[in-house]
Amino acid sequence: MNPVIKKFQFGQSTVTLETGRIARQASGAVLVTVDDDVSVLVTVVGAKQADAGKGFFPLSVHYQEKTYAAGKIPGGFFKREGRPSEKETLTSRLIDRPIRPLFPEGFMNEVQVVCTVVSTSKKIDPDIAAMIGTSAALAISGIPFDGPVGAARVAFHESTGYLLNPTYEQLQASSLDMVVAGTSEAVLMVESEAKELTEDQMLGAVLFAHDEFQVVINAIKELAAEAAKPTWDWQPKPEATALLGAIRAEFGDAISQAYTITVKADRYARLGELKDQVVAKLAVEDGSPSASEVKAAFGEIEYRTVRENIVNGKPRIDGRDTRTVRPLNIEVGVLPKTHGSALFTRGETQALVVATLGTARDAQLLDTLEGEKKDPFMLHYNFPPFSVGECGRMGGAGRREIGHGRLARRSVQAMLPGADVFPYTIRVVSEITESNGSSSMASVCGASLALMDAGVPMKAPVAGIAMGLVKEGEKFAILTDILGDEDHLGDMDFKVAGTSKGVTALQMDIKIKGITEEIMEIALGQALEARLNILGQMNQIIGQSRNELSANAPTMIAMKIDTDKIRDVIGKGGATIRAICEETKASIDIEDDGSIKIFGESKEAAEAARQRVLGITAEAEIGKIYIGKVERIVDFGAFVNILPGKDGLVHISMLSDARVEKVTDILKEGQEVEVLVLDVDNRGRIKLSIKDVAAAKASGV
């Protein structure tokens, strides 16, 4: 056992890469340690042979957080880790995105990456360590891979500027949380959320990260120089030049003509007909070229045709130029019984978005390595197969749906009011009912509209736009509001969301090298132009949040009581508060400082609960008249209940101006009477009078 270890300084942290001690049977294995804060074991295994007939690259990335890493035992009956959490799924996608385009075209061997968090101090997110480890493990595995890749997280403060690899605590005070990954030459992936930063500030963060993670790339190269296995002897299949030429010669014009059909379904139908004709004419049964090879060549001609048209300035697939946003149709309040709803349609992409308000108890409970916490905002994205005119699996959310939902959430989250202003739990659901590109950005627009329709006091409306890029040699074209086909055939997917003042989310995935600062700057500027256009049209429908919540939403009443009254409201074993909730159908949340939030399905229910709480916490006021109930009669007077839990004594001498021989001559138990509070002594005992009520009323009490 001869482990190879490389250490390097990365910002304020010391990073250690170690291989050759753990998981030695994997193709590549690296243990990444950041100071004493995080340790992640990353393994890579590649299959030596590709599965026959597989038409895609079977790369899978699994990021997993073990509870023992934080000194915890899993909850639940089985006491072991179960299905991946949303955080694990999102981090798996984060690692996958920058490495996938660096495998050679045509490489179909299965590759599996497993990142296991084995130790954490809960100060920093382990995702950057996992990304560095993945790059290092691939670099030493011998698998064909055009790396290594570096990665970094960037925060931003107006006073101090950019901060490399911040802690959780530092992120709390930051206006930016951005993860950037790339090679020594180019940026490949950006994932971020921000608080209305400018386009220049966002671009500056990307370039700052790219400069800073060069030290990571150099360290991985040094590790690979000492520990890498021999590179696989893999050669791509030679390009089917003759087959491509035959298809282009006979069907090129027809394919080009098909891409002038602006309706997606009609275009797909025509391309399907052409593909069938090409296969029937050129495919050889049990020979070469096979039907699958002909179909692949047909797809390559499609790819080249669309790209050539775009970079040569011809109209796009649906007839637009490069800067035009598809026609918008915007409606709000489309579902009568929901709390807030919007139908956002952009061309052939449509999202039905619904906002629902709940109580603090409806917040999502998250059990993370950092500990349990409650999340009062949820945004869920659903992509049913009918949205693209297909039959398909229905079930739980997949990785793509979780990722798109998180992007939409990041986009609107910064514009939500704080819990001190709006203490409701918020759930937004985006149902994609039609899709032809940029459904996640349609979800952003729809979410902003639905939240304003629900009366959530948004700081500003938010819109999102997806940009694309086609680059051939020195020629390039940046596309505003890309279609699904343009996303698939293009070189970059660049999504920007924000308000009229600045960016709230930026996501970028690049499939090629050579994306320059100039191209990113132009794309951000073009995205701003489109975003302002969309916001202008949204504001014509609903420019600000409604003044009142929907009548269907729960009513919330906030109040505060003395802390020494909390136990009175709760009661022995919670009996009092439970009785109030059951009888009024409201829910009550009490904080240690005496703050109370009452949620009711109706205003009447919430008000009834408030009155009950007031009754319990109220103090008897000297000189005030109360309607009380006789609880107990004794020889010297009667005890009358005037407030919940508060009885006072009406002495026999205070019953009437006339002489009273027996209390029962005047009162009986259960009788309601008007009483005047005469005095409250220092022990809280209340002295009442019945005979002085008339005089008190006459004097205006």
Swiss-Prot record:
Keywords: Cytoplasm, Magnesium, Metal-binding, Nucleotidyltransferase, RNA-binding, Transferase
GO BP term, pick one: RNA processing
Reactions accelerated catalytically: RNA(n+1) + phosphate = RNA(n) + a ribonucleoside 5'-diphosphate
Cited Gene3D superfamilies: GHMP Kinase, N-terminal domain (3.30.230.70), K Homology domain, type 1 (3.30.1370.10), Nucleic acid-binding proteins (2.40.50.140)
Annotated residues for binding of Mg(2+): 487, 493
Cofactors required: Mg(2+)
Known EC number: 2.7.7.8
SUPFAM superfamilies: Eukaryotic type KH-domain (KH-domain type I) (SSF54791), Nucleic acid-binding proteins (SSF50249), Ribonuclease PH domain 2-like (SSF55666), Ribosomal protein S5 domain 2-like (SSF54211)
Domain S1 motif: 623-691
Compartmental location: Cytoplasm
One GO term describing the cellular component: cytosol
Recorded GO MF terms: 3'-5'-RNA exonuclease activity; magnesium ion binding; polyribonucleotide nucleotidyltransferase activity; RNA binding
Domain KH, residue spans: 554-613
Stated role: Involved in mRNA degradation. Catalyzes the phosphorolysis of single-stranded polyribonucleotides processively in the 3'- to 5'-direction.
Family membership: Belongs to the polyribonucleotide nucleotidyltransferase family.
Listed NCBIfam families: polynuc_phos (TIGR03591), PRK11824.1 (NF008805)
Subunit structure comment from the entry: Component of the RNA degradosome, which is a multiprotein complex involved in RNA processing and mRNA degradation.
Protein name: Polyribonucleotide nucleotidyltransferase
Organism: Pseudomonas syringae pv. syringae (strain B728a)
